Amino acid sequence: MESSSSDYYNKDNEEESLLANVASLRHELKITEWSLQSLGEELSSVSPSENSDYAPNPSRSEKLILDVQPSHPGLLNYSPYENVCKISGSSTDFQKKPRDKMFSSSAPVDQEIKSLREKLNKLRQQNACLVTQNHSLMTKFESIHFELTQSRAKVSMLESAQQQAASVPILEEQIINLEAEVSAQDKVLREAENKLEQSQKMVIEKEQSLQESKEECIKLKVDLLEQTKQGKRAERQRNEALYNAEELSKAFQQYKKKVAEKLEKVQAEEEILERNLTNCEKENKRLQERCGLYKSELEILKEKLRQLKEENNNGKEKLRIMAVKNSEVMAQLTESRQSILKLESELENKDEILRDKFSLMNENRELKVRVAAQNERLDLCQQEIESSRVELRSLEKIISQLPLKRELFGFKSYLSKYQMSSFSNKEDRCIGCCEANKLVISELRIKLAIKEAEIQKLHANLTANQLSQSLITCNDSQESSKLSSLETEPVKLGGHQVESVKDQNQHTMNKQYEKERQRLVTGIEELRTKLIQIEAENSDLKVNMAHRTSQFQLIQEELLEKASNSSKLESEMTKKCSQLLTLEKQLEEKIVAYSSIAAKNAELEQELMEKNEKIRSLETNINTEHEKICLAFEKAKKIHLEQHKEMEKQIERLEAQLEKKDQQFKEQEKTMSMLQQDIICKQHHLESLDRLLTESKGEMKKENMKKDEALKALQNQVSEETIKVRQLDSALEICKEELVLHLNQLEGNKEKFEKQLKKKSEEVYCLQKELKIKNHSLQETSEQNVILQHTLQQQQQMLQQETIRNGELEDTQTKLEKQVSKLEQELQKQRESSAEKLRKMEEKCESAAHEADLKRQKVIELTGTARQVKIEMDQYKEELSKMEKEIMHLKRDGENKAMHLSQLDMILDQTKTELEKKTNAVKELEKLQHSTETELTEALQKREVLETELQNAHGELKSTLRQLQELRDVLQKAQLSLEEKYTTIKDLTAELRECKMEIEDKKQELLEMDQALKERNWELKQRAAQVTHLDMTIREHRGEMEQKIIKLEGTLEKSELELKECNKQIESLNDKLQNAKEQLREKEFIMLQNEQEISQLKKEIERTQQRMKEMESVMKEQEQYIATQYKEAIDLGQELRLTREQVQNSHTELAEARHQQVQAQREIERLSSELEDMKQLSKEKDAHGNHLAEELGASKVREAHLEARMQAEIKKLSAEVESLKEAYHMEMISHQENHAKWKISADSQKSSVQQLNEQLEKAKLELEEAQDTVSNLHQQVQDRNEVIEAANEALLTKESELTRLQAKISGHEKAEDIKFLPAPFTSPTEIMPDVQDPKFAKCFHTSFSKCTKLRRSISASDLTFKIHGDEDLSEELLQDLKKMQLEQPSTLEESHKNLTYTQPDSFKPLTYNLEADSSENNDFNTLSGMLRYINKEVRLLKKSSMQTGAGLNQGENV
């Protein structure tokens, strides 16, 4: 009994130590939770600053706060409020980032944000690790608690079975095992405590880093405030610019009056020019008659073109026949595919049995190798085809060098033989490839059959394995039945353990077999999937082979057709060679015509020089006025800066007032609604003003057209400047209206602030929100200022460009006027000399006229043949373009045919390179032309001998060429300007598309963000549920407080979710509104640019028309001079020398013009080749006049063609402009509708926001109450901790006193033992267990153990308990010690008197009390229950000591 009681006391000690350790763990968990909460608050305070700069993922901060704060819903409830601000701030910043590229500090800010985010991610990871550690500790705590309850139940069972002596040793062994387990768990818990301490240190370090990041964020905020100040300054500058623009408009009106006076002077000069134009028109009529003759020739050539088209149609019919044949071949291929599909179906039936993985992998590798070999063979075939083509080209070049007339027929025969041989070789190769593919397929089928046999073998092995497994299971079942029969018999504990071990082994074996079966099943499924993939690859290979055979056949047919075409082309080239000879004769006659044109061009240049001088004088006036305007604009800027500074001071005052005042959210919403209504009214007013402006523009245009009919060029310049100034006026008016709106808003805010001075600071959070909103609005205004500055800069650039263009035009006009003056002077001289020489030349002209008529006929024939050749070349080019289009269609149809496409691409690349290099025609035509060029080079050698005789004609031709090139330059410039405008229109359309794509991308990103937020909210809900579950298990002693907090959490979660949804909707709507506004602004700007460009196009077209008319007049004058030059051709040697010098100068100018005009090089090369050909036939000197006349007719025809092209292009441009206008109007209508819808939705959302704000206020009040309760609890905990520390110090003093008492008692015991050693009847071993153990040893042992227990529990844990309990325990322990000291001498004396007497009932009260204690249900889960249990035990010890003392006294009396 004594041993059992000592064991029981040891168990109590261990249980109490476990409880103390558990309490210490709870305390440490609380400390970690508080540290994590403080860290979460710091993160939440840092996160808004980060999100204000850049916040693409606003839900991250929310996730972190919820992860860190699982047990304090008060702080958790504060975080969503901050997150709302973060989301609202981040969305606007996220939208403004791509637009606000003006800030120079964006790059370092982004880098700092990235570093902070990396730190936050690290902190989140560490927090997650801490959370997992907390969860693991909680699970360990629950397991320990469960084991404690089990141990208590076992102890109670042992106490009830103390009388059974046989079960005592078994229970002692179990208790020892439990003690060992508990000690191991204590070690684990201590290790966990160490880890928690380390984690707390890490958290402190991270808090320091977060403070540094906060300081950086504060710096960023300061930078943002500075930027807002800059925006205010920009507003002041805008006001100054408006004032300056008004002054400019007044100055411009004065400038208009001056220009009108100058225009009247110019009109008088124009009347003189009109008289000259009438003379030019008469000459133009003569040229038109000659154009009629040339048109008749063109009709003849058109008939020839029709014949060639018929031949092309015949060729197309042949191609259709070949397509029918191809369809038949495809039908045969489909039949073959059906047979292949049947074979494949047979293979699929057999593939179900296949299960070997490695064999299939090897087969796939072999198949891939063979496919690669086949691809290599096909590549070799392609290389051979290309090599054959290269050989053909080399042979054709060799043949082209030989004389054509001798070896044309031999070359044809050789080509046909060589091509047929190459085609036959290619066919043989294709057939060989097909046969090789068939052999590969047959080999694969054989291998499949072999593998089927192997798979069947594997199947048999599997069945054998299954039978063995079934036998094993039968044996296991028999053994289990035997074991069950043995269990009926009475067996010891060791036998049962052996049977359980066998059962476990059997279960493990069964599980292993099941796992192996599952692995086999998965392997079989994988093999089946791989077999299906291999079959699909085989079918694809077969299809590809069929396609390749069909492609080779098509290539052969195309080559045959090309050979036939080449033979036809060679026959046609022989005809064209004869026609070229006739053309050469005609070109000689044209050389004479160019000489007369040179003289007329000189006169035109003089006239242009005079006009350019006038234009320069106008430019000087414009520049002076422009300087005045610039000075006025600078003054306006200075005024604007001063106003901006004043506005900044006012804004600073308003901000100081904002810190003192409190604004109500409902009143602000009302003001916002009123402001929106004002904005709508002002928008209508703006629309009406726009209409009035458009009407005024129309009226001004009509007035300008009536005034400025004489000089259209000057009028266009003036109208352009007026339009631009009006646009500036309209832009300035819009800016004024915006500034008036802002001023009205500021005045309204001032009035509201004066009314709200009486109220005090009640809602600090609302002020923060309002400040953020105003910051965003200031940023928007700054953005608008930047946009306006950009528009002003662009307009200034446009003005500068227009001034440059005007200067260029004036320079050209001056040059032309100078040329015209020179020509007039020369004409006067020539007329005086020609009047004298006409009489002499009349007789000679009559003889020359007959010869000229004969030569004109020859020239007409040559020109006709040359034109036919040109037309045929154009036809061939068109045919080539059609062929290219057909090839592109074939590419689209054959997307699946990869190999065929590669071959066609190679052919197309070759043809394109050859066309771009030389003549954009077929190879065979180029080679034939090379042969003609060789003949021309031989003729050039002859020309060098005759150059001395033809220098006069050559000089005249160069002068005319220079004039023609100038005309072409003018036309090319016009074409280039048109092309540039086309490119600008295309760029604008591309930019619109890019904007649309960016908008769609942003929408997709928003959707992705919404999905991510939903997922994170779901995860947060799960974690919150886990946290609440853990809190319920740990904190059962806080029942009432937890119920209140749970209710608050539920309400807050609902409000948070509703707020998040509303904030998301508001953000999305704000984003859409901003996007719509930006789109409208961009489109308005684009429309302004388009209108400007359209006006410029119209003006340039009018200028070109005027230039064409001037050139026509010049041409008429030139025709008049041709008649005089016929008669003066013999006696004008001196004048020819002058013209030679001019020709040399023009030659230098031509060399420079060739470098600048890349597009005109081809035409110049043709003209040079024709001139070189004409020089061979220029021996006849009398035919100069006739050639000049014919060449003038050709130039007229070309000019007519160019005019027609220009008109067609102008029509196209006008049609495109109209289509753009219509599209813009439609888009404007749609945007207006969308804007109305947005307004309706915004009003509905405002009402919802009001409701949410009311709910937020209620939630805030509840939060404040919860925070007050939490603060009270914190104070109570601190008070209790102080009490516990005082109790620990008192216990240390008591422990020292106890050690002293024990030393004294041990001394007394030794002295008494020595006294009673000579007693004969009893020994010390008999005395000690009877007397000393029950009273002294047991009492001292229990008292000392209680003290140590209390010391451990208090030192290990800092849990809260009452002061009274501590005082009671200390007083009771001291009283017990005093009583024991008093009872020692009496008990010793009695024991010496009655050594043989033993009292059997001395320990019955103790046993009774122990049974009573075991029967009671002690609450060890709470601190109060534990303290009650300790007090009960101390009282029981007192009672037992008193009872033992009374029993001894009774024995003495007896």
Swiss-Prot record:
Residues 107-138, 170-402, 438-464, 508-1309 form a coiled coil. GO terms for cellular component: centriolar satellite; cytoplasm. The modification Phosphoserine is found at S45, S1355. Residues 828-851 are annotated as: Disordered. It is found in: Cytoplasm, Cytoskeleton, Microtubule organizing center, Centrosome, Centriolar satellite. Keywords: Coiled coil, Cytoplasm, Cytoskeleton, Phosphoprotein. This is Coiled-coil domain-containing protein 18.
